[in-house]
Regions:
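Cys/His-coordinated zinc-finger cores
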Residues: 150-170
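A generic structural signal for residues embedded in beta-strands
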Residues: 24-25
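A short beta-strand-loop micro-motif that forms or neighbors metal/cofactor-
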Residues: 167-180
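Helix-boundary capping/turn motifs
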Residues: 17, 28-32, 151-152, 158
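Residues immediately within or flanking Cys/His clusters that coordinate Zn2+
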Residues: 36, 51, 131-134, 147, ...
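Short Cys/His-rich metal-coordination motifs, predominantly Zn2+-binding knuckles/fingers
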Residues: 137-142, 153, 161, 176-179
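Epigenetic mark-reader domains in eukaryotic nuclear proteins
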Residues: 1-17, 48-140, 180
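Short beta-strand-centered aromatic/proline hotspots
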Residues: 21, 31-45, 52-55
Length: 180
């Protein structure tokens, strides 16, 4: 328990500041996206100030090994890095989805992120330590990169990895009525 905080659960007055919510933290340099934490608990100090117990998400470039080609632009890692943040400092809301949920979004906004890995910051370890790979390049899935399924083998490929382009694949699929 944080030494300055009494264990008096507070009322959670708004959607933006409730248990389980994530919010953009704009402390990193402006060139980097926000580094959102997830609220786990809100407590009231003896002074009446409210504090949030949060766990931080890490961007790939902050983790051991750095950003890889398969990490998407909006990818974050859950972590075991906990901290306390003043509730009054929270000024926004964002959503951190599991990868499958993110793939199902009809529209991805600036406040949508996704996660598929947990990162133990103190040890520099990831879970899971292996993920499925796709395409001739044998890379894990990156939702930012266009892929097409081969009807013959039902495998997924990046057009450029099989000597094609997104435009050529789109025109081919359009001519056969397979693309909206």
């Amino acid at each position: 328990m944080h030494p300055r905080i009494s264990r008096v659960p507070s009322e959670i007055p708004t959607f933006k500041k409730s248990r389980g919510d994530c919010f953009p933290d704009h402390r990193p340099p402006p060139s980097l996206p926000p580094n959102p934490p997830r609220i786990h608990e809100i407590v009231t100090e003896a002074t009446g100030d409210e504090q949030c117990h949060v766990s931080w998400f890490y961007r790939p470039e902050e983790a051991r090994g750095g950003r890889k080609a398969f990490h998407g632009e909006k990818e974050l890692f859950t972590s075991d890095h906990y901290d306390w943040v003043a509730k009054s400092s929270i000024n926004g809301h964002c959503a951190v989805h599991k990868l499958k949920e993110y793939q199902m979004l009809k529209e991805v906004t600036d406040n949508d992120y996704y996660t598929r890995f947990s990162y133990k910051a103190s040890k520099g370890e990831f879970k899971p330590d292996r993920v499925p790979v796709y395409c001739a390049c044998e890379m894990p899935y990156n939702p930012d990169l266009f892929m097409v399924e081969c009807e013959a083998c039902e495998e997924w490929y990046h057009p450029q990895c099989v000597g094609s382009t997104k435009k050529q694949v789109s025109l081919f699929l359009l001519s056969y009525g397979q693309l909206d």
